[in-house]
Amino acid sequence: MTIFGESAGAMNCNILCASPMAKGLFRACISQSGAFMSSMSMVTQQQAEMLGSMFVQQLQKSSIEELRAMDAKSLTGTGVNFMACTPIIDGKVLTDEVYRLYELGQYADVPVMLMYNSDEGAVVEIETAEQYKAQMNGLPQNYVDSVLAIYPADTDEQAYYSVRDVVRDLNFGWPAYAWATLQKKTGKSAVYSAYLAQKSDRTVYAKGNRRGAAHADDIMYLNGSFLKEAERYPQEATVSEIMQQYWVNFAKTMNPNGAGLPEWPVYEEGKKTVMQFNNGATLIETPNMVGISLIDRFMQYVRKVKAEASGQ
């Protein structure tokens, strides 16, 4: 079977690829807008137990049995921060950080198709440049300077768009890049990379002032929403039809290519091997690499600090 997910579903696919418990249960993977490649996105068993204890206290319960007895509406309506619910390096489902497992080649080496969208961060809004800059509190100053050079905030309008680009590159662009490049280095199976940049006045979550496809907009293209209104959305319908054909081909054969479609080569860093969906399908180099390169250096710094702190 081919596993397939978007956003949180894509992150789940990434965990399945990295988990020794899931090896052999699927033959290919499609991941759209999500992966747990950052060292900051997972916790150890000890940290998880501490967070779990805090979670129980917030809900004013005293045992797992009491938590299990709660109905879903009561649980989700409590205002509890579920962002602490993150992958756990427990020695079973995950034996190490996902990035490290990919470095070591300890993952399901199956064909993968990875995609994210050009305006993923359009679901995030800030009002002022000061709000944007405040989010960098705690970062080393050299990284703050580099961030502001690439994602400027001289005006509120600049900051409005910069925060969206940071969200896109940090949460979606870099994880896809890290996954693709690491699997190319340590794996043997094909890696296909894609980028949805089609702009439309229809969206799933985002508000106005968008520059391309926002987070979750890819769902509309794959479920055929635009095909039902092709006269009103001709460009979107064209992209939708192309994407559907590629996705079905990959699910069937582990290769997206097929009759009547532009040839989609396997991913090669620094070459035009990323399939961009924008008024059709064309090949480009990895997009947004200036920002992604900065994030890659920062993630190296984070891994180094964590290793030194743990005595590794």
Language-model segments: which ranges?
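Serine-hydrolase-like catalytic core of hydrolytic proteins
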Residues: 1-65, 92, 100-127, 188
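Mature extracytoplasmic/periplasmic domains
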Residues: 205, 257-287
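Tryptophan-rich aromatic "cage" segments
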Residues: 281-312
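Short, solvent-exposed turn/loop segments enriched in Gly/Ser/Thr/Pro and often Arg
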Residues: 4-10, 194-202, 262-268
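Substrate-gating cap/lid region and adjacent catalytic-acid/histidine neighborhood
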Residues: 28, 66, 73-237, 246, ...
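Sec-exported extracytoplasmic/periplasmic mature domains
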Residues: 18, 57-61, 72, 184, ...
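C-terminal catalytic lobe of FAD-dependent flavoproteins
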Residues: 243
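Acidic glycine-/aspartate-rich tracts in secreted/extracellular proteins
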Residues: 8, 253-256
